[in-house]
Amino acid sequence: MFQTLRNAFKVKDIRSKIFYTFLMLVVVRLGSQLPIPGVDRSYFANWFSQQVGDAFNFFDAFTGGSFEEMSIFALNITPYITSSIIIDLLTIAIPKLEEMQKDGEEGRKKLTAITRYVTVGLALLESIAMVIGFGRQGLIPDMTAMNVITVVVSLTAGSAFLMWVGERITEKGVGNGISIVLMINILSRVPSDITTLYETFIKPQTVAKGALAAVIILAVIVVTVVLVILLNGATRNIPVQYAKKMQGRKMVGGQSSSIPLKVNTAGVIPVIFASSLMSMPSIIAAFMGRGNGNGIGSKILKGLSQQNWFSLSNPVYTLGFVLYAVMIVFFAYFYTSITFNPIEVADNMKKQGGFIPGIRPGKPTQDYLEKILNYIIFIGAIGLLIVCTIPIVFNGAFGASVSFGGTSIIIIVGVVLETLKQIESQMLVRNYRGFLSE
């Protein structure tokens, strides 16, 4: 692999793309340190330390700590991620958007433009909501019109700029720009998480016990990463045979292919959906200045917080995990139904003279695909749940408050593998052996 890296840097085009990507990521991290004029940067740092829930910790992990620091990139690329998911969902409900999706490159350009507009709109709404919800509570010490406008414009412009950076990386760099920016944000929190793990499990122990704890933590991380790699790479290939037919005086067709169905078809989307919905009540309560009492509402909010699940002192809060698990399985089926349509696949196969050996074309093929799909979706959802549960157990049972969870690992591994594949394809074009063949 290291030899391949050296070979990659020998190719001017690939080397330029890697350097371009690196420079853009440096800009992202530098921008994360630029403060917004007119805000109290210590407000969220103090506020986070007093919160019992982890709703905003989930959000802050995706921003690389920019939200807690209240930099100009506080909203980061989360509005873009949200708008992309919204547009994907609307393609089913709105026929015009569905036509654009199927209209090749021209249609994709139109959808991209719509996603940009929705991103800016969401960023503006989130900025206004943040100013209204936290401004008078101390985030903006001097609530003048100029300060309010400055904060709203800074947050919106920062999110729009990061969207532009992501698109430039996709166009001129390596990998998917938005995904790489998200990965770097998550990785930027790793040093603080390592410090937390050290102070929680290793520092208070003797040398022998501390070493054992370090080995166990490392083993858990390695096992989790391996599970994610297996989950991302696992596929079920459905064999497809095409009937022979006469074209003029020649017999054509008869070739065979396959339909690769990924076990984790929905990717990390079910986890993001489930985590976002579980966090929503706590976020609303925070904007309203509520949720820190001892009433039934506060207990419900604590039950929805991941850091309270598997708590040895309050096992009843683990009911929140049951709801979380059900939501992940539900969204795995829901999102896969959007991205893969067995009816459409079966119909296209029938039109092209294709069939699955042993299965009749048409409705039987559709039923067979649905049966296989339902099975592998369930396996993929359980795999996602296992990966996400491991860090949650550490947080709840041992009180290790870390942001580097299963969602983060899934995103990082997925982005790394996808970027390596892209570099691999460029290397193969130039007759070099690539990463994935070693």
Segment roles from a protein language model:
Residues 1-101, 105-438:
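N-terminal cationic and glycine-rich segments that engage phosphates or anionic surfaces
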